[in-house]
From Swiss-Prot:
Protein family (similarity comment): Belongs to the peptidase T1B family.
PANTHER family linked to this entry: ATP-DEPENDENT PROTEASE SUBUNIT HSLV, METALLOPROTEASE TLDD
Protein name from the UniProt record: Proteasome subunit beta 2
Major place of residence: cytoplasm
Protein's cellular compartments: Cytoplasm
Length: 196
């Protein structure tokens, strides 16, 4: 499979999770938009991705509805793992005509911060940090050299920003600013935009 345009990065530390992506929306050598948000809050979860932008938007809408449906029908909140597994099943259902996307999905529950990586057909992998998209090869080197699960969320946000900036410098399909989503271990959420 060809690399999917964009760069998205996720990082799990003891204090929470951070997801980030750049904002460029491009196909081939053409930049369609410089304002494409690829990091979303879905209920109490965070999701970021690389790939076909319409597919990412559709998956975000589907997950919003499915999570609400689960919680209404069961009367209890869905766990991070169960929500990630739900996304995995949704992706697998479309394996013949897949969503062209690589997804980072995370959140915090009673088991602590969790980060999952999903491919277009629903493979589900839990990890401490991950990068997807065309800038992933560049970003992962930055993450591997400096990642520490004991770093605080501010340092984690700085590291993820550094990794995205490195990708923007070398990947033509990444650029136009950085969206950061931060969730601490209590579930508090913060969203930031960093011009770059």
């Amino acid at each position: 499979m060809e690399e999917l345009p964009a760069t998205a990065i996720g990082l799990k530390v003891n204090d929470g999770i951070v997801l980030a992506s750049e904002r460029r929306l491009s196909y081939g050598g053409y930049v369609l938009s410089k304002q494409a948000k690829k990091v979303h809050k879905i209920g109490k979860f965070l999701m970021a991705g690389a790939g076909i932008y319409g597919d990412l938007q559709t998956l975000t809408r589907i997950m919003n509805v499915e999570i609400k449906y689960y919680e209404i029908s069961t009367g209890k909140p869905i766990s991070v793992h169960a929500a990630a597994k739900l996304l995995s099943v949704i992706l697998y259902q479309y394996k013949v005509m897949p969503f062209i996307s690589e997804i980072l999905f995370g959140g915090v529950d009673e088991k602590g911060p969790q980060l999952y990586v999903l491919d277009p057909i629903g493979s589900l992998i839990e990890d401490n940090y991950a990068a997807v998209g065309s800038g992933a090869r560049i970003a992962i080197g930055v993450l591997e050299s400096e990642y520490d699960p004991n770093m605080n969320l501010d340092i984690a946000a700085q590291l993820i920003t550094k990794a995205i900036k490195a990708s923007i410098e070398r990947d033509i399909t990444s650029g136009d600013g950085i969206d950061l989503a931060i969730m601490d271990k209590k579930g508090n959420y913060e969203n930031k935009f960093i011009p770059y």
